[in-house]
Amino acid sequence: MVEVDVAVVGAGIAGLAAAHHLVAAGRSVRVFEGGDRVGGRMASSRVDGWLLDEGAETIAGAGYEATWELIRAVGVPESEVPVIEPGFALWRHGRAHPHLGHPKGLLTGAGLSWRGRWAWLRFVAELGTAWRGFDPDRPETAPSRDATLSEFCAGSAGRQELLAAMLQPLSSHCFGWRPESSAVAPMVATLLSVGGAGARWMTYRDGMDTLARRLAERLPVELGRRVVAVREEAGGGPGSDPGPGGVRAGGVRVEFADGTRVRARQAVLAVPAPLALELRGDDLPDGERPYLAASTYTPMLKVACLLDRPLPSPTRAPSYAVSVPESESRICTGLILDHLKADGRAPAGKGLVSVFASPWVSPELLGEPDERVVETVCAEAERFLPGLRAATVRTLVHRFPLGLPQGAPAAVRERAAFLARPTRLVEYAGDWVMLRPSSEGAVRSGKLAAERVLAHAAGAAAGAEAGAASGTAAAAAAAAAAAAAAASASVGRV
């Protein structure tokens, strides 16, 4: 059986970030990816001169500290991460309104009535008072507790309009959420961390997979290695060889679909929570199961429309994206004009538009043939971007059954206990760990997972030394508890 120091399962940005930080700390890693490329939900593809971002679309200039740390570490120049100059628009009452979520929208309206704008102002004031001191890395501590978006906005006509014309369109378009199923705390935490929906958004000039590709170039990554089970094993005996971190060999068994196995001293599962549940099976500790089970996902389904010409912004003030409220459509939740998002997304004189299926139809359409998905979603999108179908020369459907963390109320309730759990041989990474549905959430979780791996190894080594000196297990237990406390305390610093 092949033996490795730390096995990282999943070569999305969370797994690659974890591997990067572990290597920087002196550990040896091997990354196993079931697919044929790295990036996960940050994957991009190149088709006949078009550059398609299949999953994630943007990063932010503020609130993405962990991402920018990696960008600098791998040597991506800031000039290769341009600012997206156009903004977001809202489709309402038969037309697109610019400045959705941007302070300018208070003046222009952004599709809101005066009552809705007043509710927006009161919401901003509430964030500055009742939410003051709130740590976006700890959404479970929010004043809203586990209230859903719908519950949070109940009680007044103004708040209900704020939901209908801002919070619901943004959450459905960006996260694939339904307001009655997702908690408001993770959304507010995400927006507060970057400075609001009108933040300074950016993208990678060479595709959203840029950072993942650069990281993978520096790491041992094995593609086409689908993992089917991850099991903790009893550690080696007194005569076994401790690894670089002091953890004895044989700690984790990784089983692959082709029947092969790898033994690792420690492991990081950088996969969505539902998949982590499957991989751990009955081996999953009771203290981890509640949060993993509560960390449900929403599917994401979008159609890339390759155009024979660039369609113009739907608003006079340039907008590269249009969010569509549920009240206007339960089929199409939004569009992105990628040729306005960044240069190079389409060949000269051509265009590219991404059409997002709404969370009300995505589950139904996910398993349907491409032709039905395109016909259903793009026919509806024509209402919001006239000329789309006539300009389309080719379509590609991108499906993510496990699209983004749902931010369910149960996950908000269970997260504190999950963070306080002891470190173990198997740790986790993914934006679900941070309860922050974004690439920054994934990167931060990778850094946290690396810290917990190192803390566990340090605790095991200290416990072994203390146990040998004292002849008791109490010292080992104390060292492990200290390692867990240190790792949990690091959440707010990643």
Residue ranges and their predicted role:
Residues D48-E140:
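Dinucleotide-binding Rossmann-like beta1-alpha1 core, especially the glycine-rich loop
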Residues V228-V353, P359-L366, F384, A469, ...:
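Mid-domain catalytic core of redox enzymes
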Residues A14, R37, P274:
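Conserved Rossmann-like nucleotide-cofactor binding loop
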